Amino acid sequence: MNTRVTPTTDLDKARHDLDVVGYCIVEDVAPSELVSRVRERVLEQASAERDTGQAFVQDGNTQWVANVLNKGEVFLELLTCSETGLDLCRHVLGDGFILSCSNAPIAGPATGRMKMHSDQYWTPTIQQEPLAYDRLGENGLDRSEVSHPAVRRDYLFPPCMVTLVWAITDFTANNGATVFVPGSHMSGLQPDYRQNHTDAVPAEMPAGSIVLWDGRTWHATGANETRDQYRIGVTNNMVAPMIRPLVNYPYSLRAEVVERLDERQKQLLGFSTWTAYGNEGVPMQDLKYFKPAADQPGPML
């Protein structure tokens, strides 16, 4: 499949692209004023982390500003500024999905392309032999299968994750736009990260847009071939409510951030239960938010 997705404001088309191609692009989602404030805060934080020796740099010149919800109220504002992206996440995951992590990657000049991967890299390959199943704890990031995305499987493991990236700067083919292998989410396989995957296409979009993809879709941060452009995004990874998030938000969020959360944000950040998942020790407890552990009963005689 050589389909190249283009930006749209038509949510029906976006859902179709997401279902059939594995990713979609929606433009004009975030207000330009909000995008400007996010960009300013990302650059300020990135500079401070470099100056204090706390910067996390990957693939040569890509700096990740991690756990951004602790690093400025503007990131919390961005998380729920529009229902468009959240509706598309719901289209894939259903109700109750939660945030797994929120980071701001900055792809700097002369940065090579990331290795091709899927975010749902631990997904087991569907087996017909009952005892030939994958041991999920052994499916790490270095897992690869010599495969071709055009191969379709009769049975597929469903998507458990969706990644939503906000374009804080323009994403172009030569400044590090995310690249995708169209249709790869339907292969039931993981990419061979040692291959070049020349069939990958860039998700080009203007600032204020979002690109959103199925957790099974093969993708990578593209190469930034420019001399002076920094491609900035904010990456929000969403997971089904029974999946363990990358970041434990009830534990890791600063107290002043938790105090600002509204009910929608609390649900997205895992402060409420989903059926019996996330309870405080009382089965099927329906919690809107967690209480301090000191409030829980201890040994009793």
Predicted regions and their residues:
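Non-heme Fe(II)-dependent double-stranded beta-helix
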Residues: 1-20, 27-143
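Short, well-ordered beta-to-alpha junction loops that form the rim of enzyme active sites
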Residues: 29, 102-104, 167, 183, ...
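Active-site rim elements
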Residues: 72-78, 151-152, 197-201, 220-223
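A structural signal for short, well-ordered beta-strand segments
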Residues: 102-104, 164-166, 234-238
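Non-catalytic surface loops within mature trypsin-like serine protease
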Residues: 108, 168-170, 238-240
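Catalytic core of non-heme Fe(II) oxygenases with the double-stranded beta-helix
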Residues: 112-204, 244-253
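Non-heme Fe(II)/2-oxoglutarate
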Residues: 191, 210-212, 217-218, 222-301
